[in-house]
């Protein structure tokens, strides 16, 4: 071994080592891989062309794709340079019997390795071999099909197998910058969710078709997104508490900032029911006679309003009492006659209205039939005897005040012991409403609102009496220093001015401390 063989080893990384082994600038590596575009594809849509045209540089486009691009951008999609539509050259590709592009002179099929050229003056496309042998070497610069003369500069290279840079899709200007022309038909088709379903079987397509026929999601979504109508606040429906929007916006950044307190609006039904103070009266005309009913509108306003509205709507006309149990109840109010149908006047079930002073005691109590708590609709029943165990289960809203003989005749009708259905039909022919307290309440509310419209709000009066913000400044009396001092304040009366006389002041008389008399006692 030689001496001093490690003498040049350093205890640190040298510049040459860092550059070549450990760091330094690396040689450029192309970030994108080469992607070859076939010769029969449009350089803009990257799809097979139908109406081929080319630029003077030999870049091929489809006429249907390049025209909208030029109208919007006016540039060459592959290079980004300016391009005029007049400079485009229409190409005439020849096809063989199998539908393949080929040279019309040598009949050789064009492939990705064929040297393809086009003549500018005619647009005919040939192989370079045919043009070289029959035109260039023969010094006969005439088109091989039309015999039209051309120059050497009119030969445009469409594809050169030795130079494929213009066929590299990764280097296209519109691909790098993600530029494209949006087709209106395609944009409209994208709005349909089925546009994104590429491969579906027949069962899926049939299911989707049925869904689209019955789908109402857009209407429901539009209804939910629509802002609720703001109710008008007046002296009648204004609550003694606010909406709480000020405090909510103060404590939560998700709320819209509010700086003024607004009174909450009392529900219209709650307001109307405050004015209902009377009983309602309805007559049921049955095939067994008439039943006169008194309704407790002042105690159960919601239930009574539902019954009166349905009677006025002639909802019960032609319905039957589908259930009758002797010494218990008779039930009706179902248009289907099955005991499972019927709906309320508002189209949805409403809550129970239990009152401690109303009980199923005695004969002829009118009560609501339901299928559970807060499921009142249109069905009702009339008791034949006391049923106190039904309290707080069914809403009592009236009683029979006339026609007990009719009620007895209805009870005497025999029923099927299995279904409790009367063997003889007990029918409600028509209904008559004699007293409707809700119409009177609506008229009274309308009259009260007319009165309040002519009265000025007390808060508005206070605001009108307050001075405007622009008139709150002090009054000026002159210009310059002391312009705010009233002239009368600078004048003093003669009594207030100090006396200039030299008269000596009178000496104060000391009070005597003698005994005196008893006059001060």
From Swiss-Prot:
Query: What family is it from?
Result: Belongs to the cyclophilin-type PPIase family. PPIL2 subfamily.
Quote a single Gene Ontology cellular component term: nucleus
Q: Which GO terms describe its molecular function?
A: peptidyl-prolyl cis-trans isomerase activity; ubiquitin protein ligase activity; ubiquitin-protein transferase activity; ubiquitin-ubiquitin ligase activity
State the organism of origin: Mus musculus
Please give the pathway this protein is involved in.
Protein modification; protein ubiquitination
One GO biological process term: protein localization to plasma membrane
Compositional bias of kind Polar residues? 465-478
**For this protein, what reaction is catalysed?**
S-ubiquitinyl-[E2 ubiquitin-conjugating enzyme]-L-cysteine + [acceptor protein]-L-lysine = [E2 ubiquitin-conjugating enzyme]-L-cysteine + N(6)-ubiquitinyl-[acceptor protein]-L-lysine
Q: Which residues form the U-box domain?
A: 35-108
Q: Which residues form a coiled coil?
A: 197-217
Q: Glycyl lysine isopeptide (Lys-Gly) (interchain with G-Cter in SUMO2) crosslink: positions? A: 216
Tell me which Pfam families the record gives.
Pro_isomerase
Where in this protein does the record say N6-acetyllysine is found? 483
Places the protein is found:
Nucleus
Quaternary data: Component of the minor spliceosome, which splices U12-type introns. Within this complex, interacts with PRPF8/PRP8, EFTUD2/SNU114 and PLRG1. Interacts with isoform 2 of BSG. Interacts (via the PPIase cyclophilin-type domain) with CRNKL1; they may form a trimeric complex with HSP90.
This chain's protein is named: RING-type E3 ubiquitin-protein ligase PPIL2
**The protein's Enzyme Commission number:** 2.3.2.27
> Any idea which UniProt keywords this protein has?
Acetylation, Coiled coil, Isopeptide bond, mRNA processing, mRNA splicing, Nucleus, Spliceosome, Transferase, Ubl conjugation, Ubl conjugation pathway
């Amino acid at each position: 071994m030689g001496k001093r063989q490690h003498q040049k080893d350093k205890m640190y990384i040298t510049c040459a080592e860092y550059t070549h082994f450990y760091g330094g600038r690396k040689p450029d590596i192309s970030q994108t891989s080469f992607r070859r575009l076939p010769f029969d594809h449009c350089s803009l849509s990257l799809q097979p062309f139908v109406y081929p045209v080319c630029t003077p540089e030999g870049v091929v486009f489809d006429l249907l794709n390049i025209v909208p691009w030029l109208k919007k951008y006016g540039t060459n999609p592959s290079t980004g340079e300016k391009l005029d539509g007049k400079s485009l050259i229409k190409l005439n590709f020849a096809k063989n019997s199998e539908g393949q592009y080929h040279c019309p002179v040598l009949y050789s099929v064009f492939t990705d390795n064929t040297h393809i050229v086009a003549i500018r003056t005619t647009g005919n496309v040939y192989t370079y071999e045919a043009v070289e042998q029959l035109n260039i070497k023969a010094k006969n610069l005439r088109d091989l099909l039309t015999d039209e003369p051309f120059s050497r500069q009119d030969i445009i290279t469409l594809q050169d197998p030795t130079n494929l840079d213009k066929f590299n899709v990764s280097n296209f200007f519109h691909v790098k910058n993600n530029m494209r022309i949006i087709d209106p038909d395609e944009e409209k088709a994208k709005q349909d969710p089925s546009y994104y379903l590429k491969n579906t079987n027949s069962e899926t397509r049939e299911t989707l078709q049925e869904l689209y026929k019955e789908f109402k999601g857009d209407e429901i979504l539009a209804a939910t997104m629509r802002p609720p109508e703001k109710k008008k606040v007046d002296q009648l429906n204004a609550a003694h508490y606010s909406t709480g929007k000020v405090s909510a916006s103060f404590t939560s950044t998700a709320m819209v900032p509010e700086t003024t307190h607004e009174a909450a609006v009392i529900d219209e039904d709650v307001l109307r029911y405050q004015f209902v103070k009377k009983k309602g009266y309805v007559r049921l005309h049955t095939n067994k006679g008439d039943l006169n009913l008194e309704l407790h509108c002042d105690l159960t306003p919601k239930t009574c309003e539902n019954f009166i509205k349905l009677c006025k709507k002639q909802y019960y006309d032609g319905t039957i009492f589908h259930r009758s149990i002797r010494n218990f109840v008779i039930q009706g109010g179902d248009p289907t006659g099955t005991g499972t149908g019927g709906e309320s006047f508002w189209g949805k079930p409403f809550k129970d209205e239990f009152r401690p002073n109303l009980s199923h005691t005695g004969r002829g109590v009118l009560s609501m039939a339901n299928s559970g708590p807060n499921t009142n609709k249109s069905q009702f029943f009339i008791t034949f005897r006391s049923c106190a165990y039904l309290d707080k289960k069914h809403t009592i809203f009236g009683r029979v005040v006339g026609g007990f003989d009719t009620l007895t005749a209805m009870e005497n009708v025999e029923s099927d012991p299995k279904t409790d259905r009367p063997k003889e039909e007990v029918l409600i022919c028509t209904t008559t409403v004699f007293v409707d307290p809700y119409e009177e309440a609506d008229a009274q509310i309308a009259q009260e609102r007319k009165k309040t419209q002519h009265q000025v709000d007390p808060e508005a009066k206070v605001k009108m009496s307050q001075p405007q913000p622009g008139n709150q400044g002090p009054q000026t009396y002159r210009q310059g220093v002391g312009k705010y001092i009233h002239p009368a304040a600078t004048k003093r009366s003669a009594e207030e001015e100090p006396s200039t006389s030299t008269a000596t002041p009178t000496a104060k008389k000391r009070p005597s401390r003698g005994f005196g008399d008893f006059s001060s006692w």
